Structure formats: C-alpha cells, structure tokens
C-alpha cells in the first residue's frame, strides 16, 4: 500500500513497515509526508492483525524535521508544531513501534524516532536535535523524550549545543540503543519485529500501555511548556535570518 511519500510494506502478516520516502524534501516534514504518516498510523490502528511496526526512511535519510517553509511559518506565528501531531504517533500507537533509523535523524525527525518503543541507530548516520542552531528552543517534545531516552547529561549537551553526532559517536557516549552499520539496521529491526510478533497481541498492547503510561501522562504538560518557550524565543528577526541562512547547512 503506497501513499505518495509513505509506503506501507507488510513484511509478514503481523509486521508492517512504514517507509518514509519524500525524496524531494529529504524526508523533512512536508505537508505531504505529514499527512501520509498520520494516515499510515490510522490505517495500522484500524487493522488489528498487526503486532509490530517498523518505522524507517530511505537511503541515507530517516527523517529531517521541519521544512524551511514550515519553520518560517512557525516563526511568523502562522502555525505551531502542535498543529500536526507527528511527534507522538509512535507513542500513541497501540502496538510496539521500532524506529529503524538507518539514515540521518535531524531535529524533529530525530525526536520523532526517539518516541518509538525500540530505537536502532546507524553508525554512519548523523543525529542532531538542532533547534538551537536556528536560535529557538526545542519543540516536538524534545525536552522530554531526549533526556528520557538518552539520559539527562547527554541530553543537556545535545539540546543546548545543537551539535551533530554520528551514530558511532553516540555509541561511544553510551546510548542505550543498538548501533549498527546502515546496511544491517533494517534486517535487525525485522528480527526484533518477528520476536515481538510471536507474542499475543493483547499482551503486547497491555504491556506497552503500562510501560508508556507515564510518558503519555506527562507529555501534554511538556508540550505546553515548549509552546510557551516558543512564544519567547521563536518570533525574533535573528531566528528568521538563521532559518533562511543556515537551513540545510
């Protein structure tokens, strides 16, 4: 099943792969990719035969965060990152989601992957929460999920400094994720999904509900706080010029 920029691949009867492939925007969150992702997870929600989801990108890209146009619209006060609830698609999905981040994860794209239940990184790929590079504070739940998944000290560095890290660098820093050569990421994700699919669906759903309940409970308050910080930090001329001058560099 293929939407224009998201392909749904049924690997086995109980395992579905959500492949993001907006090559025009290098998997940045274009309106097309956003809409197709939301539709893909709605399709999964309506199909109770599935027990595991593998979320992945194409070639060297996992997901690249906001488009330049999208960031400028937020800067101008026309939209908010909450208008399209991409960040919690994996968290809200009933069944386990594996983020097979075979390619670069940039900004909100990296954050979206971290909301998955299981995360796999690629040694060669670059991962960054680069919000502060443009001069605005992080959104999409980054200030919540990055510390939760990577640990507070590393998260502070990643969020404040907005630096770029190869998967191999993060492996040396002790991230709790499997870090593999890019060519092996998807195969490993499929192996994990097959192991998940051996379990009863009801038990998978029940346990995920229990494990992520604190995250689901706390996230809305954090999103409110991030929006308040955006009101303080986003609507400045310096941010506008940074988005125009630094985007894609």
From Swiss-Prot:
Output the Pfam families linked to this UniProt entry.
ECH_1 (PF00378)
Q: Name a biological process GO annotation.
A: antibiotic biosynthetic process
Give the subcellular location.
Cytoplasm
Q: Source organism's superkingdom?
A: Bacteria
Q: Which GO terms describe its cellular component?
A: cytoplasm
Task: Report the InterPro entries cross-referenced here.
Answer: ClpP/crotonase-like_dom_sf (IPR029045), Enoyl-CoA_hyd/isom_CS (IPR018376), Enoyl-CoA_hydra/iso (IPR001753)
Which EC number applies?
Answer: 4.-.-.-
Which residue positions are annotated as catalytic?
A: 230
According to the record's subunit comment, the protein's assembly and interactions are: Homotrimer. Does not form a heterotrimeric complex with PksH.
This chain belongs to the protein called Bacillaene synthase decarboxylase PksI
Tell me what organism the protein belongs to: Bacillus subtilis (strain 168)
């Amino acid at each position: 099943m293929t939407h224009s920029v998201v392909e749904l691949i049924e690997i086995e009867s109980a395992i579905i792969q959500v492949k993001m492939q907006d090559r025009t925007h290098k998997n940045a969150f274009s309106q097309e990719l956003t809409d197709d992702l939301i539709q893909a997870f709605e399709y999964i929600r309506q199909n109770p035969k599935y027990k595991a989801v593998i979320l992945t990108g194409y070639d060297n890209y996992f997901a690249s965060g906001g488009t330049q146009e999208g960031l400028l619209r937020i800067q101008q006060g026309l939209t908010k990152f909450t208008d399209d609830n991409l960040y919690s698609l994996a968290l809200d999905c009933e069944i386990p989601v594996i983020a097979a981040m075979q390619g670069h994860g940039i900004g909100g794209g990296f954050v979206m992957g971290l909301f998955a239940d299981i995360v796999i990184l690629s040694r060669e790929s670059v991962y960054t929460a680069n919000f502060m590079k443009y001069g605005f504070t992080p959104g999409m739940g980054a200030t919540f999920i990055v510390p939760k998944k990577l640990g507070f000290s590393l998260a502070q560095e990643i969020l404040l400094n907005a630096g770029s890290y190869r998967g191999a660098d993060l492996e040396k820093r002790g991230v709790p994720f499997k870090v593999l050569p890019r060519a092996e990421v998807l195969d490993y994700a499929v192996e994990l999904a097959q192991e998940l699919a051996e379990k009863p669906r009801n038990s998978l759903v029940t346990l995920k509900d229990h494990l992520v309940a604190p995250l689901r409970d706390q996230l809305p308050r954090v999103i409110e706080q991030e929006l308040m910080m955006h009101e303080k930090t986003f609507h400045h001329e310096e941010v506008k010029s940074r988005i125009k001058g630094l985007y894609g560099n």
